[in-house]
UniProtKB/Swiss-Prot annotation:
GO terms for molecular function: oxytocin receptor activity; peptide binding; vasopressin receptor activity. It comes from the Eukaryota. SUPFAM superfamilies: Family A G protein-coupled receptor-like. Expressed in brain, intestine, bladder, skeletal muscle, lateral line, gills and kidney. It comes from Catostomus commersonii. It holds the Pfam family 7tm_1. It is found in: Cell membrane. Keywords: Cell membrane, Disulfide bond, G-protein coupled receptor, Glycoprotein, Membrane, Receptor, Transducer, Transmembrane, Transmembrane helix. Disulfide bonds join 116-191. This is Isotocin receptor. GO terms for cellular component: plasma membrane. Residues 1-48, 108-124, 182-206, 298-311 are extracellular.
Length: 390
């Protein structure tokens, strides 16, 4: 049984201390970790944080999708990629954060082996998809700034997005074979990983870190290096143009200034999207760097303090990335949420007006019925009076 515990490595995408421990192994000389127990105080903090992250991720990304759907001008590539990044973040929230939250509450995985493998598979699909959509956004902004005359066709955009989702689905397949429902104690079962010893866990975690973090971050760095260089070149050219404009005549000066101002407006629009994508990338790096640092450390160092609080915090910090992006969208593309707010206000106003019209119609119909009844009763009374007189 002890050998089976040693097969379970830190790469289970579970922030709980129960899954980040290796049974009956001693870390730091005299610290023995028992996989059948957990720190209840830490578990309560994890449950609270994950519940908050789940709520913010669901609410924020659903608002982004609704705003993009209801907006008038959302045919650009940027909005298309934003939509798929929000979908990927929703996948992370529903299939990674939510199962982890339930798992932290129940302490053990209660479900069949098929569900264990499915949960582990879907947990990585969202991570791959979110990362690759972010890479696509950065490449798109790099092309828009460095080669503005080159226009990616909408079909190519769709092909790139489909390829990203396909790679996410394929790269997550090893999770199905690594994790299964296993007995970790006398009659105690949990969703546990089985790596080939002694190199299996190291190879797998290194490969995951390369495909989700190291290679994408290198691509992102290259894209923003080119973008920064191109913006610097553009700034120098505009400065020279402004100096040349001051030497022209007054008549041509107005026309030239109008042309330059229009160019500046286009550049500002592009630079705004570049800033937004850069902040999204920065948030991704801040949230995921501690996570992958911890993963690599725990894989290559058998004496890594897996139950130390910095390890737990780094795991929880990774979950925050799925709820950061909507707030970044709101800051840089506030008109989307303003349009959504206006649409909701218009819908509520129309609903109130329609309900008021229905009430007025019902009131008018009741009033007409009452007047008809009064007329009928009055005419009947007159007929009775006339008959009595006669």
């Amino acid at each position: 049984m002890e050998e089976m515990f040693k097969e379970q490595d830190f790469w289970s995408f579970n922030e709980s201390s129960r899954n980040s421990t290796v049974g009956n192994e001693t870390f730091g000389g005299n610290q023995t970790v028992n996989p059948l127990k957990r720190n209840e105080e830490v578990a309560k903090v994890e449950v609270t944080v994950l519940a908050l992250v789940l709520f913010l991720a669901l609410a924020g990304n659903l608002c982004v999708l609704i705003a993009i759907y209801t907006a008038k001008h959302t045919q650009s590539r940027m909005y298309y990629l934003m939509k798929h990044l929000s979908i990927a973040d929703l996948v992370v929230a529903v299939f990674q954060v939510l199962p982890q939250l339930i798992w932290d509450i129940t302490f053990r995985f209660y479900g069949p082996d098929f569900l264990c493998r499915l949960v582990k598979y879907l947990q990585t699909v969202g991570m791959f998809a979110s990362t690759y959509m972010l890479v696509l956004m950065s490449i798109d902004r790099c092309i828009a700034i460095c080669q503005p005359l080159r226009s990616l066709h909408k079909r190519k955009d769709r092909c790139y997005v489909i390829v990203s989702w396909a790679l996410s689905l394929v790269f997550s397949v090893p999770q199905v074979y690594i994790f299964s429902l296993r007995e970790i104690g006398n009659g105690v079962y949990d969703c546990w990983g089985d790596f080939v010893q002694p190199w299996g866990a190291k190879a797998y975690i290194t490969w995951i870190s390369l495909t989700i973090y190291i290679i994408p971050v290198a691509i992102l760095g290259g894209c923003y290096g080119l973008i920064s260089f191109k913006i610097w070149q553009n700034f120098k050219r505009k400065t020279k143009k402004d100096q040349c404009i001051t030497l022209t005549t007054a008549a041509s000066k107005a026309n030239a200034l109008a042309r330059v101002s229009s160019v500046k407006l286009v550049s500002k629009a592009k630079i705004t999207t570049v800033k937004m994508t850069f902040v999204i990338v920065l948030a991704y790096i801040v949230c995921w760097t501690p996570f992958f640092f911890v993963q690599m450390w725990s894989a290559w160092d058998p004496e890594a303090p897996r139950e130390a609080m910095p390890f737990i915090i780094s795991m929880l910090l990774a979950s925050l990335n799925s709820c950061c992006n909507p707030w970044i969208y709101m800051f840089f593309a506030g008109h989307l949420f303003h349009d959504l707010k206006q649409s909701l206000l218009c819908c509520s106003t129309l609903y109130l007006k329609s309900s008021q019209c229905r009430c007025d119609q019902e009131h008018d119909s009741r009033k007409s019925n009452c007047s008809t009844y009064v007329i009928k009763s009055t005419s009947s009374q007159r007929s009775i009076t006339q008959s009595s007189i006669t």
